[in-house]
C-alpha cells in the first residue's frame, strides 16, 4: 500500500509539472529594454497629457503605452502627439540610452513638438532599425555625414524639426530607403546628386527648407516614386525633363513657391494618376498646355502667381477639390464651366483672372461645402448674397476690387466664417454685429453708413465709406 501511495503521489506530481510546462508564462520584457525606456522617460521634463503614465519600473514594459514587443524584446516604440490638442506634447530630450533597445526596428516619435537636442546618435547603435520617424519637434544642428552608415534603413523622416546646413551627400548610401522626408527644416545648399542612387523611393519630400540651385535632372532613377514635394524652397531653372519618367505612378507633384522659369511642360498631361499639381508662386511663362485636359483625376491644381497667358484649356476633371489660378495674365471672362459643374469643391481662388460676369449667373453644382472663395480684383457685378447664404462651412470669402452691390446686413455670416474681404465694391447698409465673430474683416471703400458695432478690427477695415462712425473711427455726431 505504501508503494502504491508513493507511486500515486509521484504520478500526481508529474501531472502537475506537465500542466505547468504546458501553461504559457507571461515573462517580463528584457531588463535592457526597460532600462532604456525608463531613461527616455527620465529625460522628459513635461508630459501634460500623461502619454508615459503607464511606464512604471517593475511592470512589464511590453505592456506600456506605445511599446510593442516580440519574444519579450522591444521592437517598436511609438509615442505620438495630436496636433489638434494643445497639451498633447512632450518636452525634454531623447535619452541616448535608447541604444539599449537593440532589437528595435521602428521608432516613431511624432508630433511631440518640444523634444530638443542634436541629431540622435543612439540610432547608430541599433542594428535592426529600419524605420525612423522623429517628426514635428525641435531637434537642431546638422545632419551628420555618418547618417550614411544607417544602410539598413527603409524610412527616414525628420519632418518639421530645426536641422540646418546641407543634406549630407552620404545619404546616397541609404539605398534601401523607400521614404526620405526632410521637409520643414532649415536645410540649405543643393540636393545631392547621389540621391539618384535611392531607386526604391516612393516618397521624396524636401519642402519648406532653404534649398537652392536647379532641381536635379535625375528622376528617371525613381520608378516607384509616388510623392515629390519640393515646394517653398529657392530652386531655380526649368522643370527637369526627367520628371516625365514619373508619369506612371506619381500622385503628388508639388514644386510651388520657388523661382522656377520656363514653360509648363506638355508631358505633365501624361500623369494620369496625378491627384495634386502645385506649380504656383514661380516665374513660369507661356500658355498652359492643352495636354492638361488629360488629367481627369486631378483634385488639387495650383498655377497661381506666375506669368501664364491665355488661352486656358478646357479641363476634363470629374471633380476638383481645390483650384487656384490667381494672379497670372488670364482673361477668363467667366468662371469656367468645368469648375461650375464640379460635384465637389472646397477651395476656389480666381483672383485677378479677368472675369467679367454677373455673380448671379454663376450657378455652381454645389455650394454647401465651399471653404474658401477668392474672386478679388476682377470685374464681377451683382450680389454674392444668394451664393454665400447657401454655404454652411465657408471659412473665407475675398472679393475686393469688384463691382458687387448688396446690403451687408443681408449676408448670413455662418459660424465657420473667419475671413471676409469685400473692400472696394459698392456695398451699402450697416455693419452687422455678427462680424465680431470674424478673425479678419475688410469692408473699406464702400458705401456703408451708420454706427459701428463693438469691434476688435482696426480703422483701416472701415476707411473710405460714406458715413460710418464710432470706434475705431470718429465718434458719431449727436442728433
List each model region and its residues.
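Plant-biased, solvent-exposed loop and capping regions
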Residues: 1-479
Amino acid at each position: 500500500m505504501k508503494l502504491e501511495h508513493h507511486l500515486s503521489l509521484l504520478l500526481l506530481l508529474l501531472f502537475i509539472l506537465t500542466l505547468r510546462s504546458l501553461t504559457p508564462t507571461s515573462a517580463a520584457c528584457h531588463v535592457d529594454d526597460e532600462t532604456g525606456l525608463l531613461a527616455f522617460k527620465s529625460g522628459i521634463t513635461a508630459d501634460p497629457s500623461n502619454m508615459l503614465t503607464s511606464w512604471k519600473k517593475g511592470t512589464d514594459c511590453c505592456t506600456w503605452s506605445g511599446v510593442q514587443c516580440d519574444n519579450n524584446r522591444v521592437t517598436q516604440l511609438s509615442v505620438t502627439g495630436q496636433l489638434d490638442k494643445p497639451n498633447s506634447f512632450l518636452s525634454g530630450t531623447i535619452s541616448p540610452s535608447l541604444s539599449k533597445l537593440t532589437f528595435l526596428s521602428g521608432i516613431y516619435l511624432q508630433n511631440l513638438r518640444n523634444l530638443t537636442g542634436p541629431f540622435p546618435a543612439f540610432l547608430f547603435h541599433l542594428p535592426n532599425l529600419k524605420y525612423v520617424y522623429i517628426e514635428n519637434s525641435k531637434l537642431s544642428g546638422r545632419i551628420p555625414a555618418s547618417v550614411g552608415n544607417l544602410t539598413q534603413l527603409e524610412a527616414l523622416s525628420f519632418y518639421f524639426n530645426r536641422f540646418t546646413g546641407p543634406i549630407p551627400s552620404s545619404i546616397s548610401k541609404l539605398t534601401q530607403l523607400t521614404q526620405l522626408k526632410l521637409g520643414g527644416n532649415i536645410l540649405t545648399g543643393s540636393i545631392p546628386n547621389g540621391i539618384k542612387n535611392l531607386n526604391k523611393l516612393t516618397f521624396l519630400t524636401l519642402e519648406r527648407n532653404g534649398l537652392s540651385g536647379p532641381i536635379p535632372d535625375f528622376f528617371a532613377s525613381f520608378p516607384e516614386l509616388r510623392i515629390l514635394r519640393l515646394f517653398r524652397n529657392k530652386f531655380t531653372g526649368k522643370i527637369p525633363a526627367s520628371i516625365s519618367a514619373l508619369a506612371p505612378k506619381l500622385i503628388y507633384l508639388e514644386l510651388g513657391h520657388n523661382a522656377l522659369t520656363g514653360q509648363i511642360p506638355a508631358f505633365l498631361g501624361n500623369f494620369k494618376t496625378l491627384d495634386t499639381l502645385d506649380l504656383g508662386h514661380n516665374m513660369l511663362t507661356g500658355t498652359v498646355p492643352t495636354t492638361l485636359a488629360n488629367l481627369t483625376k486631378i483634385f488639387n491644381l495650383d498655377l497661381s502667381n506666375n506669368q501664364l497667358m491665355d488661352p486656358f484649356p478646357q479641363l476634363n476633371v470629374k471633380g476638383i477639390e481645390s483650384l487656384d489660378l490667381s494672379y497670372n495674365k488670364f482673361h477668363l471672362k467667366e468662371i469656367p464651366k468645368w469648375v461650375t459643374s464640379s460635384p465637389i469643391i472646397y477651395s476656389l481662388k480666381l483672383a485677378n483672372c479677368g472675369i467679367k460676369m454677373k455673380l448671379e449667373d454663376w450657378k455652381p453644382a454645389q455650394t454647401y461645402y465651399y471653404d474658401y472663395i477668392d474672386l478679388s480684383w476682377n470685374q464681377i457685378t451683382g450680389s454674392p448674397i444668394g451664393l454665400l447664404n447657401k454655404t454652411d462651412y465657408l471659412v473665407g470669402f475675398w472679393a475686393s476690387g469688384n463691382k458687387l452691390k448688396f446690403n451687408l446686413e443681408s449676408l448670413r455670416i455662418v459660424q465657420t466664417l473667419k475671413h471676409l474681404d469685400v473692400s472696394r465694391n459698392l456695398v451699402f447698409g450697416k455693419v452687422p454685429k455678427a462680424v465680431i465673430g470674424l478673425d479678419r474683416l475688410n469692408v473699406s471703400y464702400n458705401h456703408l453708413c451708420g454706427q459701428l458695432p463693438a469691434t476688435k478690427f482696426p480703422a483701416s477695415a472701415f476707411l473710405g465709406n460714406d458715413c460710418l462712425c464710432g470706434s475705431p473711427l470718429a465718434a458719431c455726431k449727436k442728433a
